Regions:
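Alpha-helical transmembrane segments of multipass membrane proteins
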Residues: 27-35, 39, 102-107, 192-197
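N-terminal transmembrane-helix/juxtamembrane module of multi-pass inner/ER membrane proteins
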Residues: 2-74, 112, 217
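Aromatic-anchored segments of alpha-helical transmembrane domains
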Residues: 32-33, 100-106, 168-179
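Internal transmembrane alpha-helix with an interfacial aromatic "cap," most often the third helix
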Residues: 70-87
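Interfacial helix-loop-helix junctions of multi-pass membrane proteins
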Residues: 138-140, 170-196
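Alpha-helical transmembrane segments of integral membrane proteins
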Residues: 19-27, 90-98, 163-166, 184
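Membrane-interfacial alpha-helical segments at the cytosolic side of multi-pass membrane proteins
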Residues: 75-80, 145-164, 190-200
C-alpha cells in the first residue's frame, strides 16, 4: 500500500501528469455518457444481417453470468494491478476512451442487425447505464473482447498477463455462444484495441508527453 501511495504522490507532484490525469478522466466520462444516446439511436436504425457459418458449429447458449464475471473481475483486478503505475493506468484510460470512439465510428459506418438466435446479454451495470433498455445492435466490433485485450496489453509481463490473454479467448468464445456478436466482430476487436493504444502512445510522443518507455507487456 505504501508503494502505491508513494507512486501516486510522485505522479501528482508533476503538473503535466496531474493535468493529463484530469483530462483523461473528463474525456472518458464524456465519451461514456455520449455512448448512451448514441446506442439508443443505433438500436432504432435498420441494418444488414450477416451469414456467419461459425454458428453452424456452435449451439446457442446463455452465458451471461460467465461473461459478466469474467469482464468485471478482470477489470477490477486490472485496476488493482495497475494502481502502482499511475502513468500506465492513465494511458489505459485514454486508449479505452479512444476505442469506444472507434466503436461508435464503425457502428455508424457499418450498420448491422444482430445475429439470428441472439440471446440477450444480461448485464446489470450496462442495463443501469442504458436506463434498462436492451442494446443488441452495438456490433462491429466487440467491446467486451476489445476491453479484455486492452487490459491484456496494459498489464506488465507475468502470470496475470497470461491469464488475461486466456480471458480474451474465453470471452470471445462465450460471446459467440451467446450470439451477441458475429465472429468477425470478435476477431477484429483486438486489432482495434491495439490500434487505439498505439495511437495514444504516438499522440503522447507528438505533444511531448513521455510514457516512461512504455511497451505493452513490460
Amino acid at each position: 500500500m505504501s508503494r502505491i501511495k508513494g507512486s501516486w504522490i510522485n505522479f501528482w507532484k508533476i503538473p503535466d501528469q496531474r493535468y493529463e490525469f484530469i483530462f483523461a478522466a473528463v474525456i472518458l466520462t464524456v465519451v461514456m455518457l455520449s455512448s448512451v444516446p448514441f446506442l439508443t439511436q443505433i438500436e432504432m436504425r435498420p441494418g444488414v444481417q450477416l451469414h456467419d457459418p461459425v454458428f453452424n458449429y456452435l449451439p446457442a447458449h446463455d452465458l451471461s453470468d460467465l461473461i459478466f464475471y469474467i469482464l468485471y473481475t478482470a477489470l477490477l483486478l486490472g485496476v488493482i494491478f495497475l494502481l502502482p503505475s499511475p502513468e500506465r493506468l492513465v494511458i489505459g484510460f485514454e486508449a479505452y476512451a479512444l476505442f469506444v470512439v472507434l466503436r461508435m465510428i464503425t457502428m455508424t459506418l457499418v450498420p448491422l442487425e444482430p445475429p439470428n438466435g441472439l440471446i440477450p446479454l444480461v448485464d446489470p451495470i450496462l442495463s443501469f447505464m442504458y436506463t434498462g433498455k436492451q442494446v443488441n445492435k452495438d456490433l462491429f466490433f466487440s467491446g467486451h473482447t476489445a476491453t479484455m485485450y486492452l487490459l491484456y496489453l496494459m498489464l506488465p509481463a507475468g502470470i496475470y498477463r497470461k491469464l488475461a490473454f486466456v480471458g480474451v479467448i474465453v470471452m470471445g468464445i462465450c460471446l459467440l455462444f451467446q450470439r451477441v456478436h458475429y465472429t468477425v466482430d470478435v476477431i477484429v476487436a483486438p486489432f482495434f484495441a491495439y490500434g487505439a493504444l498505439r495511437i495514444v502512445l504516438r499522440l503522447r510522443r507528438t505533444i511531448g508527453l513521455k510514457a516512461s518507455g512504455f511497451v505493452a507487456g513490460e
